Amino acid sequence: MVCMRFRYICHRKPERTFSFRGHYFPVCSRCTGIYLGAFTYFLYAFLIPVKYTAATVLLALLLVIPTFIDGFTQLMGYRESNNVLRFSTGLPAGIGLAVLTKVLKHLILHI
């Protein structure tokens, strides 16, 4: 039942999902990294004020690029990724996406 709740936020392919003691995580390894990175950044931004500049936005965009490259090269069949690499590229992407979300929120509220 828990697994069905997550079907809308992740494809949940078993071969791309971490497992612990025979139980699969509710999301794939890349999404695990993305969600963990985003949660970590939101917690950080809640505790420590962050000033968002053009450099911050550029850095956030750069953090997403490795995930794009990993996913795209796998999709095109150039190579096969693994769960550690998926998680390792998902983590900074989650941080980058969280920063971009906070910047967007700031822009919307201060227009």
Curated annotation (Swiss-Prot):
**The keyword Hydrolase is annotated on this UniProt entry:** no
Question: Can you supply one Gene Ontology CC term for this chain's record?
Answer: plasma membrane
Annotated membrane topology is: Multi-pass membrane protein
> Can the keyword Transmembrane helix be found in this entry's annotation?
yes
UniProt keyword annotations, A-Z:
Cell membrane, Membrane, Transmembrane, Transmembrane helix
Q: What is its main location?
A: membrane
Residues that span the membrane, as ranges: 45-65, 91-111
Location within or outside the cell:
Cell membrane
Instruction: Write down what this protein is called.
Output: Uncharacterized protein MTH_518
Specify the species.
Answer: Methanothermobacter thermautotrophicus (strain ATCC 29096 / DSM 1053 / JCM 10044 / NBRC 100330 / Delta H)
Write the lineage as a comma-separated list.
Archaea, Methanobacteriati, Methanobacteriota, Methanomada group, Methanobacteria
